[in-house]
Amino acid sequence: MRSGGLEMMSSSAIVAFNLKEGKNWWWDVNESPVWQDRIFHVLAVLYGIVSVIAVIQLVRIQLRVPEYGWTTQKVFHFLNFMVNGVRALVFLFRRDAQNMQPEILQHILLDIPSLAFFTTYALLVLFWAEIYYQARAVSTDGLRPSFFTINAVVYVIQIALWLVLWWKPVHLMVIISKMFFAGVSLFAALGFLLYGGRLFLMLQRFPVESKGRRKKLQEVGYVTTICFTCFLIRCIMMCFDAFDDAADLDVLDHPILNFIYYLLVEILPSSLVLFILRKLPPKRGITQYHQIQ
């Protein structure tokens, strides 16, 4: 009995020691300027890779259908190229960005790619909504004006928050700004759930022998799940970021948290979606290929 008790105490001591060592490792990495730069540079490389993949796909689409102008598909890939390219530059010069003055410039530099990411994937929701309503013989005339209006409202509100934060740099305004973006992320997640879910259910009702039905069904299902999950995670994380200093993403001494967060909400989702949507459009006779007016 006594030896068993000693073994249990020894096991508990080992577990406690391992937890302490793990905590110390996390702290050491977060506080080390060398590790901070390494992690931010790894993020820059990953974003750069995604950006290059997006622009390569854009060029392939242009070479395949040069007779079309700026279609939804081309704009989607171009925005992916821009968003990931800007993120790569931000993380490459992350330490310099943190020292920018006035401080409002730091917020703008870190927030603009997030807003552009929202616009990029809202465009995908618009594309699916158009397909869904066209298949049901419902007018889609109001969809694009709604898309531009929603984006304009989001950008105007965010710019107003930046201006107020510049005029009165209090912590309350930072909280409001982050909670606003949490709301925007939740709105995007619900958009994917609504129109991705509707399109998925509609495709399920098509005859089994329909050409491409199975592949398109999988494509819509996968992309809906990925995008809904990433925007929901972003929403939840923004709520923690707003109220908990330990979850602050806009500082240099949380590199591991930054790596996990941006990997889950931007890098992996963008990579997976670009892979799933890698199929090139047919050269002629394409009815779902919409040109941006």
Swiss-Prot record:
TM stretches of this protein: 39-59, 75-94, 108-128, 147-167, 174-194, 220-240, 256-276
Extracellular side: 1-38, 95-107, 168-173, 241-255
GO cellular component: plant-type vacuole membrane
Coiled-coil ranges (or none): none
Keywords: Membrane, Transmembrane, Transmembrane helix, Vacuole
Highest taxon above the source species: Eukaryota
Family: Belongs to the plant tobamovirus multiplication TOM1 protein family.
Name by which UniProt lists this protein: Protein TOM THREE HOMOLOG 1
Organism phylogeny: Eukaryota, Viridiplantae, Streptophyta, Embryophyta, Tracheophyta
